[in-house]
C-alpha cells in the first residue's frame, strides 16, 4: 500500500509540474522584446529629463514631460495639466530659489519600469543636492518617486508623478 501511495504522489507531483509547464506564456517575439526595450529606454529618458529640466529651471520643458491630464504631486503641493504644473513649479522655485542655477542637481537611482501596452509604472529613488556657501555638496532631500506613464501622441509622458520623502529637508524647499 505504501508503494502504491508513493507512486500516486509521485505521478501527481510530476503531472502537476508538467501541467504547469504547459501553462507558461508563450515566449515573446523579437519585435515585442525590442519594443519593450525601446519603451523602457524612452521612459527612462523622461525620468532623467525631469531632473535636467528642473536643474536648468526650464519650466516649459518640465511641463512638456506631463500628459495633457498629467498630475504632479509633491507633498502638499499638486497640480494637474502642463500649464498648472509649470505655474506650480515657477511659484515654488521663486519662493525657494537656488543661489545660482547649476549649483544644485538631481541624481536618480534604483529604478524599475513595468510596461503594459500604452501605459507603464515606475518606482525610483532620487536625491537633490545643493552646494553650500562653502561649495561643499549637501543633501537637500532624498525622495521616492511613484510614477505612472502614458503614451500620448507616440511619446511617453508622466500621467502622474508622486514624490514621497525618505529623508527630511528644510521646510518649504522645492525639489
PLM feature spans:
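Bacterial N-terminal signal peptides
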Residues: 6-16
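A solvent-exposed, acidic/Ser-Thr-rich amphipathic alpha-helical stretch
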Residues: 59-127
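Short, low-complexity N-terminal intrinsically disordered segments enriched in polar/charged residues
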Residues: 21-52, 56, 60, 64
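Short, surface-exposed coil-to-beta transition loops
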Residues: 106-108, 140-145
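Short beta-strand edge/turn micro-motifs at domain boundaries
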Residues: 21-22, 119-123, 142-172
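Positively charged n-region of N-terminal signal peptides that target proteins for export
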Residues: 1-4
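Short, cysteine-centered beta-strand-loop-beta hairpins and adjacent loop/turn segments enriched
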Residues: 129-139
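Transmembrane beta-barrel outer-membrane domains
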Residues: 41, 103-104, 138-140
Amino acid at each position: 500500500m505504501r508503494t502504491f501511495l508513493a507512486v500516486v504522489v509521485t505521478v501527481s507531483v510530476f503531472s502537476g509540474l508538467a501541467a504547469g509547464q504547459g501553462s507558461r506564456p508563450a515566449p515573446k517575439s523579437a519585435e515585442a522584446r525590442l519594443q519593450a526595450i525601446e519603451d523602457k529606454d524612452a521612459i527612462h529618458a523622461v525620468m532623467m529629463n525631469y531632473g535636467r529640466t528642473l536643474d536648468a529651471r526650464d519650466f516649459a520643458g518640465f511641463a512638456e514631460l506631463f500628459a495633457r491630464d498629467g498630475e504632479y504631486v509633491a507633498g502638499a503641493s499638486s497640480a494637474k495639466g502642463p500649464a498648472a504644473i509649470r505655474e506650480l513649479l515657477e511659484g515654488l522655485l521663486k519662493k525657494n530659489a537656488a543661489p545660482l542655477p547649476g549649483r544644485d542637481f538631481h541624481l536618480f537611482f534604483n529604478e524599475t519600469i513595468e510596461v503594459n501596452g500604452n501605459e507603464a509604472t515606475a518606482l525610483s529613488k532620487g536625491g537633490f543636492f545643493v552646494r553650500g556657501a562653502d561649495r561643499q555638496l549637501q543633501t537637500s532631500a532624498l525622495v521616492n518617486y511613484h510614477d505612472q506613464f502614458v503614451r500620448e501622441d507616440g511619446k511617453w509622458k508622466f500621467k502622474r508623478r508622486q514624490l514621497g520623502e525618505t529623508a527630511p529637508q528644510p521646510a518649504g524647499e522645492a525639489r
